[in-house]
């Protein structure tokens, strides 16, 4: 759970406790290389043939001839071995599926563009996830024998597929595309990258093939990286950045890294077997998963950067640290997922990827959201296509389930109001002795079987449910851009009805949410109906205003739920208020009397035969 969500939850809890009291850098730096870890066996599967997009060994000019034609700056950066590969002609190949369009480039042998076809940005444009400010992403990083840090994104690969090719994949079809980086034709040393795309799926398989690279890679290690984050897709960059995080899964635990302060640069080295790394925006993710064997570790780096107009952006670097065995041939396999943070899709991989979906605190809120709320939402949605109606019906169902608690709370508050005259008499009688006053009031509660916390405890018990709903409405991509009625066009963000020409400090309020306002109005009406104590009149006004300000920046779905819940509570309160307070006291007294044990009657000893003579 992000910092913003945590602060929100703390504020809600503090407000409710008050209520209870009154009622009672641009490019991230290159990462350091880890120390050697436990060795793993190598998958010896052969590379696909060139006729099927497999690895080829292109013929280049000799090493001495190539080095002499390279400018000195390339030699200084990449060294004599890799400098000749820093120039070339770019070719691109496009892969089209029903879910995305991917553009791959020979410059870096990596992904240049990844556009989702079923999602649009807040501007209505297709979602492009690969950071367009850079050449592309998903590259390799290692140190050469002459101490140069080699990032393959800056080197030119070759492929047998003609440049400009477009491959259309139907659902269920696969296609393998290979790129080769010929390091030295004399000893047939090369690095090959293979991509196997699958129609109808957001993930693709990838292989790194290293042939005769023993004399070129130092430290027996290399990294598989996603270096430049993901493009933002939502209107509010501050809100989206608060959900942007880098993750690694190691030792059965999901490790997260957040660059939560403006201008902050944070990093984390993960040691030991690592099953995946991922980075997220609010609704989308890029994850790299080693297949066959875990990675030796991971490296996470993040930087928070301010944007114009008080905007904010977090850019992350995630890398798997792989062991290079120094064998003549090494093949490492990966699965890469680039797509929506759909809980059900991520969970279907059975590797814990669903942990990156922000569903609240692991031990308290998340189980409620994950195993109760989400299944309930999906079940209702299987019958009703509109998520706004799903929320309304869900609110009604939840109100019915919580009805015993709600009725108990309302009755307790009514009885407390009915006892006010007696309590005033006690306070007047014992105004000089606080201890006797408190004891007399507690005896009064005991006599009428009233729990002084009865009006507050049910609301407190509902807090985990409210937090779980907040997490779902904020992070569930199925609600993204889901409209309801009238002005409510997106249930996952605030339903703005008015833009303010200024921003209110501290709370960051620069717009007015219609549903938050309706929620506050219904809360005021309910408070007005239920609170009669003159000393609590301040709370009648304070609580709705406080909740309006707090909920103003919350998702419309959460405010819709709370609004409907309040409407139903107003109806309950109306019918309860129709009963006179005196009647409630009488009923409490009668119940007390009816529970008193009756004195048993004496047996009638009228039979003469039973008498003593």
Task: Name each model feature, range by range.
Residues 1-43, 104, 198-199, 206-211, ...:
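Helix-loop-helix
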Residues 1-2, 33, 50, 57, ...:
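Generic N-terminal leader/processing signal
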Residues 21-123, 128-129, 133, 179, ...:
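Juxtamembrane extramembrane loops of integral membrane proteins
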Residues 62, 85-86, 96, 258-259, ...:
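General structural signal for secondary-structure boundaries
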Residues 72, 85-355:
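Soluble non-transmembrane domains of integral membrane proteins
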């Amino acid at each position: 759970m992000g910092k913003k969500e945590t602060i929100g939850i703390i504020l809600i809890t503090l407000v409710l406790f008050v209520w209870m009291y009154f009622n009672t850098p641009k490019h991230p730096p290159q990462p350091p290389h880890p120390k050697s870890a436990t060795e793993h066996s190598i998958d010896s599967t052969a590379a696909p043939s060139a006729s099927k997009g497999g690895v080829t060994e292109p013929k280049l000019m000799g090493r001495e001839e190539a080095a002499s034609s390279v400018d000195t700056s390339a030699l200084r950066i990449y060294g004599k071995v890799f400098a000749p590969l820093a120039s070339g002609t770019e070719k691109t190949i496009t892969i089209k599926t029903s879910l995305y369009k991917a553009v791959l480039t020979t410059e870096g042998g990596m992904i240049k563009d990844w556009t989702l076809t079923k999602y649009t940005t807040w501007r209505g444009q297709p979602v492009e996830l690969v950071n367009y400010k850079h050449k592309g992403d998903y590259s390799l990083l290692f140190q050469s024998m002459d101490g140069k840090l080699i990032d393959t994104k800056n080197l030119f690969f070759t492929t047998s597929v003609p440049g400009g090719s477009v491959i259309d994949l139907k659902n269920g079809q696969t296609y393998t595309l290979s790129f080769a980086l010929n390091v030295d034709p004399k000893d047939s040393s090369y690095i090959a990258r293979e991509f196997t795309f699958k129609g109808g799926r957001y993930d693709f398989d990838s292989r790194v093939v290293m042939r005769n690279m023993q004399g070129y890679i130092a430290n027996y290690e290399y990294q598989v990286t996603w270096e430049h984050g993901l493009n933002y897709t939502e209107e509010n960059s501050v809100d989206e950045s608060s959900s942007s995080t880098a993750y690694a899964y190691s030792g059965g635990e999901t490790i997260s890294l957040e660059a939560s302060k403006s201008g902050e640069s944070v990093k984390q080295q993960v040691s030991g077997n690592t099953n995946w790394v991922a980075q997220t925006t609010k609704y989308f993710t890029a994850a790299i998963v080693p297949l066959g064997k875990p990675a030796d570790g991971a490296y996470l780096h993040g930087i928070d950067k301010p944007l114009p107009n008080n905007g904010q952006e977090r850019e992350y670097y995630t890398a798997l640290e792989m062991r290079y065995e120094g064998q003549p041939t090494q093949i490492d396999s990966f699965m890469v997922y680039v797509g929506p943070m759909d809980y059900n899709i991520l969970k279907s991989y059975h590797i814990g990827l669903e942990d990156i979906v922000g569903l609240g605190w692991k031990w308290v809120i998340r189980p409620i959201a994950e195993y109760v709320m989400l299944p309930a939402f999906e079940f209702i949605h299987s019958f009703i296509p509109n998520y706004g109606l799903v929320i309304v019906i869900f609110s009604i169902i939840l109100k019915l389930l919580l009805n015993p608690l709600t009725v108990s709370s309302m009755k307790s508050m009514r009885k407390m109001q009915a006892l006010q005259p007696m309590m005033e008499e006690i306070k007047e009688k014992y105004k000089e002795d606080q201890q006797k006053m408190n004891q007399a009031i507690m005896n009064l509660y005991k006599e009428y079987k009233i729990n002084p916390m009865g009006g507050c405890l049910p609301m407190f018990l509902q807090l985990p449910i409210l937090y779980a709903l907040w997490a779902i409405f904020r992070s569930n991509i199925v609600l993204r851009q889901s409209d309801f009625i009238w002005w409510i066009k997106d249930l996952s963000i605030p339903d703005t009805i008015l833009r303010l020409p200024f921003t209110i400090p501290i709370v960051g309020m620069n717009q007015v949410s219609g549903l938050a306002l309706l929620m506050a109005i219904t809360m005021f009406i309910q408070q007005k109906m239920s609170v009669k104590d003159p000393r609590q009149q301040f709370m009648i006004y304070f609580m709705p205003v406080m909740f309006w300000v707090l909920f103003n920046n919350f998702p419309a779905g959460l405010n819709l739920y709370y609004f409907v819940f309040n409407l139903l509570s107003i109806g309950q309160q109306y019918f309860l208020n129709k009963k006179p307070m005196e009647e409630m006291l009488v009923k409490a007294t009668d119940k007390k009397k009816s529970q008193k044990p009756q004195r048993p009657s004496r047996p009638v000893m009228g039979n003469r035969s039973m008498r003593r003579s």
